Curated annotation (Swiss-Prot):
Origin species: Rhizobium johnstonii (strain DSM 114642 / LMG 32736 / 3841)
Regions of compositional bias (Basic and acidic residues) in chain numbering: 229-243
Domain of life of the organism encoding this protein: Bacteria
Family annotation (PROSITE patterns): KH_TYPE_2 (PS50823), RIBOSOMAL_S3 (PS00548)
Region annotation Disordered: where it falls in the sequence: 214-243
Protein name stated in the entry: Small ribosomal subunit protein uS3
Entry's Gene Ontology cellular component terms: cytosolic small ribosomal subunit
KH type-2 domain sequence ranges: 39-107
Keywords of the record: Ribonucleoprotein, Ribosomal protein, RNA-binding, rRNA-binding
Family of this protein: Belongs to the universal ribosomal protein uS3 family.
GO biological process: translation
InterPro entries, sorted: KH_dom (IPR004087), KH_dom-like_a/b (IPR015946), KH_dom_type_2 (IPR004044), KH_sf_prok-type (IPR009019), Ribosomal_S3_C_sf (IPR036419), Ribosomal_uS3_bac-typ (IPR005704), Ribosomal_uS3_C (IPR001351), Ribosomal_uS3_CS (IPR018280)
GO molecular function: mRNA binding; rRNA binding; structural constituent of ribosome
Role description: Binds the lower part of the 30S subunit head. Binds mRNA in the 70S ribosome, positioning it for translation.
C-alpha cells in the first residue's frame, strides 16, 4: 500500500497535518471547501514564478488566515508591500470575510518535493534533457541533507512517439515506514509534444515522536543538519527512550 498511496495523506495525523485547518457544519462545509480549492488554484496560477510550495488555510471565527510557503517571498510582497495588498484584497473578495495573509520563506527549496517537481517541469518546458534535469535535482537534494530522493517523469520524453516513464532514485525512500518524514510533490510540464507529469518523493529522516506538526516545524526551521548528524540524534533519542 505504501507504494501506491499518497505519502502525505498516508501520514496525516501521525507526523503530517492538513493544509486546510477548520471545522464547519454540513450546511456550509461544501461551500468552504470550494472556496479553499478556488483560492489555492488562484494563488498557484497568479504567483507561478514565486515558487509556491503549499498554501495553508485556517478559518478562525468569521475570518480567514492564508499562509503561503514560497521560495521567493519578495515576488509576492512586491515593492513596499504593494503586491501583497492587492493579493489580500482579491482573496478577501473570494471569501467574503476578513482575510489575513502570511508569507513564509522556504529556506531550502532543493529539498521541497513540490518545488523540485516545479523546477524540473520548467526545465522540460525549456527543452532541457529530462535525464539531466532529474540528475541535477537528485544531486542538489542529496547535497543539502536529504537521505533519499526518487523522481519519475512520464510522457513523450524527448519528443518520442510513444509515451514512457523514466525514474531516478538515490538513497533510501521507505514509503511503508510511517515514522519516515517523506515529502511528495507533483507538477506538469506543458511541452510542444504534450504534457509530461513529474512526481517527486524526498526522504528527510525519521520523526520518532507522535506529532502531526513535526514535519512542518522541521521544514520551517530549515533543517540544516546533514544525514550523519540526524543519525546521531536518532541514536541519542533511542538511548533516552530505552533508559
Amino acid at each position: 500500500m505504501g507504494q501506491k498511496i499518497n505519502p502525505i495523506g498516508f501520514r496525516l495525523g501521525i507526523n503530517r497535518t492538513w493544509d486546510s485547518r477548520w471545522f464547519a457544519d454540513n450546511a456550509e462545509y461544501g461551500q468552504l471547501l470550494h472556496e479553499d480549492l478556488k483560492m489555492r488554484k488562484f494563488v498557484m496560477s497568479e504567483l507561478k514564478q514565486a515558487g509556491i510550495s503549499k498554501v495553508v488555510i485556517e478559518r478562525p471565527h468569521k475570518k480567514c488566515r492564508v499562509t503561503i510557503h514560497s521560495a521567493r517571498p519578495g515576488l509576492i510582497i512586491g515593492r513596499k508591500g504593494a503586491d501583497i495588498d492587492k493579493l489580500r484584497k482579491k482573496l478577501s473578495e473570494m471569501t467574503n470575510s476578513e482575510t489575513h495573509l502570511n508569507i513564509v520563506e522556504v529556506r531550502k527549496p532543493e529539498v521541497d518535493a513540490t518545488l523540485v517537481a516545479q523546477s524540473i517541469a520548467q526545465q522540460l518546458e525549456r527543452r532541457v534533457a529530462f535525464r539531466r534535469a532529474m540528475k541535477r535535482a537528485v544531486q542538489s537534494a542529496m547535497r543539502l541533507g536529504a537521505e533519499g530522493i526518487k523522481i519519475t517523469c512520464a510522457g513523450r520524453l524527448g519528443g518520442a512517439e510513444i509515451a514512457r516513464t523514466e525514474w531516478y532514485r538515490e538513497g533510501r525512500v521507505p514509503l511503508h515506514t510511517l515514522r519516515a518524514d517523506i515529502d511528495y510533490g507533483t507538477a506538469e510540464a506543458e511541452t510542444a509534444f504534450g504534457i509530461c507529469g513529474i512526481k517527486v518523493w524526498i526522504f528527510k529522516g525519521e520523526i520518532l515522536e507522535h506529532d502531526p506538526m513535526a514535519s512542518e516545524r522541521r521544514a520551517m526551521e530549515g533543517d540544516a543538519q546533514g544525514p550523519a548528524s540526524r543519525d546521531r540524534d536518532r541514536d541519542r533519542d533511542r538511548r533516552r527512550d530505552n533508559a
